[in-house]
């Protein structure tokens, strides 16, 4: 895992290596962190996994909130717990990624919790930007404009 990560890290300064939240993954994160190679600990499903990743030196911790919810767990609680834990240890600099976002409420909740990053699918982004009252407002503006335009004729 480490040898492959070193090769991929040589591709550019903005490359972050995704490493799974496993015992071997934690060892790799520690080694890569010591070599200043940025890592993203992925497939995180508990605050304990996140803490271990931060202690190992992960640059990013990807908490799969949607998958947790899909399995009947409270994905947001894992994000809240992780952020609370990391707040207790200012020397841990890992950034929390709200991953596997399923709907706009996940985005709102993750932002309120203080997640550093969200991986937002295009479909959710489109849901976030659209609102029925915006559409109604546009129709009203256009109708008002037509009234003004008719008066000028």
Language model features: what each stretch is:
Residues 100-105, 123-127:
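Glycine-rich beta-alpha junction loops
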Residues 17, 32, 53, 110, ...:
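Conserved, mostly hydrophobic/aromatic
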């Amino acid at each position: 895992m480490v040898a492959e990560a070193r090769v991929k890290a040589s591709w550019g300064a903005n490359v972050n290596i995704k490493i799974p939240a496993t015992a071997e993954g934690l060892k790799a994160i520690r080694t890569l962190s010591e070599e200043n190679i940025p890592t993203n600990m992925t497939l995180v499903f508990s605050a304990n996994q996140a803490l271990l990743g931060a202690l190992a030196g992960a640059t990013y911790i990807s908490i799969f909130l949607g998958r947790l919810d899909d399995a009947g767990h409270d994905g947001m609680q894992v994000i809240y717990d992780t952020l609370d834990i990391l707040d207790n240890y200012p020397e841990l600099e890992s950034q929390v990624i709200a991953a596997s976002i399923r709907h706009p409420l996940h985005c709102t909740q993750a932002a309120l919790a203080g997640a550093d990053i969200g991986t937002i699918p295009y479909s959710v982004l489109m849901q976030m930007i659209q609102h029925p009252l915006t559409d109604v407002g546009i129709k009203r503006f256009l109708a008002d404009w037509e009234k003004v335009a008719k008066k000028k004729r």
